[in-house]
Amino acid sequence: MQIHIHRHRIREITCDGTLSIDGQHICDTAEHSQYRPLVGNYRIVLRHNRAYGRKVPTLERIDSAKPSKPAVLAIGNGIYNRHDGRIILGTYLIPGCLKWSREPFKQLYDRINNSQRRGNEVMLRITESRQ
């Protein structure tokens, strides 16, 4: 399964984008500009996260020898106090803020989980618009 995050609005603090799977728009994304994952290709694995107390989609960088801090796809409404590289999912409200985050996250989690149980690899590609 190929997941694509395209960042289209990058400001001093906020970074907004869209998430699509195999070319179909799924939801919007928000990240903190200073702590966002680097542009590139990642493998998504489900790992236990102590902060959430459950398995969450975690990004593993595959196209660079330089290690980056592991980021996760997460539930949330805003990125202003997040300094851990989380990418939150939902419906765009204003720059850096999303609404209705739980349902898109649950759908994405289920798709990733089902794909991995079938033995398929889940890949994520992050791109940015030139600004």
Task: Set out the residue ranges of the language-model regions.
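Cell wall/extracellular polymer interaction/catalysis modules
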Residues: 1-123, 127-131
